[in-house]
Curated annotation (Swiss-Prot):
GO terms for biological process: cell division. PANTHER family: BIORIENTATION OF CHROMOSOMES IN CELL DIVISION 1 LIKE 1 (PTHR47391:SF1). Coiled coil: none annotated. It comes from the Eukaryota. The lineage of its organism: Eukaryota, Metazoa, Chordata, Craniata, Vertebrata. It is found in: Cytoplasm, Cytoskeleton, Microtubule organizing center, Centrosome; Chromosome, Centromere, Kinetochore. Residues 1-22, 137-169 are annotated as: Disordered. Required for proper chromosome biorientation through the detection or correction of syntelic attachments in mitotic spindles. Keywords: Cell cycle, Cell division, Centromere, Chromosome, Cytoplasm, Cytoskeleton, Kinetochore, Mitosis. Residues 147-156 have a biased composition (Pro residues). This is Biorientation of chromosomes in cell division protein 1. GO terms for cellular component: centrosome; cytoplasm; kinetochore.
Length: 169
């Protein structure tokens, strides 16, 4: 899934031709895209995901949601009269739609986020994101303010060798 600004390598990148990200206003979509790409390239989003997943199954909201879904599925399947001609895919899709339409997933996921993600947001994730942003903008500012390299020695110009003079004696 490529996003704008992806595929850049090294320290200098630009989205939409932005040469100095520090000059963009906070909240600018180009600046956000640059920062998100920087966080992705550092693997920080993967770290956040792993950190949250390590905690999720210990939280009451997850255990409660899992129990609700298990009960819902059992009740739904108990209402079905099984026969050999049943289409398992249709049954599975119908069950999936019923779970989604019940609204229990949305409410349960919101509770999981409030128990798992929210506590980490200000104390773990925000400081790491702010540090990455600061390092990125500092590196970009240094690149932009670095003095230009002095010109190298002039390249030799190719000249045709002089023709031998013909002297008549």
């Amino acid at each position: 899934m490529a996003e704008s600004g992806s595929g850049t390598s090294g320290g200098s990148s630009s989205v939409g031709g932005v040469s100095n990200p520090a000059s963009l206003a906070p909240g600018d979509s180009q600046l956000i895209a640059l920062i998100v790409e920087q966080l992705k390239s550092r693997g920080q989003f993967d770290g956040f995901r792993r950190d949250c997943l390590a905690d999720v199954d210990t939280k009451p909201a997850y255990q409660n949601l899992r129990q609700k879904v298990d009960n819902f599925v059992s009740t739904h399947l108990d209402k079905q009269e099984w026969n050999a001609d049943m289409n398992k895919n249709q049954l599975r899709n119908g069950l999936r739609q019923s779970v989604i339409q019940s609204g229990m997933l949305e409410a349960g996921v919101d509770r999981i986020i409030s128990q798992v993600v929210d506590p980490k947001l200000n104390h773990i994730f925000r400081p790491q994101i702010e540090k990455a942003i600061h390092e990125y903008l500092t590196a970009q500012t240094k690149e932009d303010s670095a003095p230009p390299l002095p010109p190298g020695p002039p390249e030799p110009q190719e000249q045709e060798p002089p023709e031998p003079s013909q002297s008549v004696s």
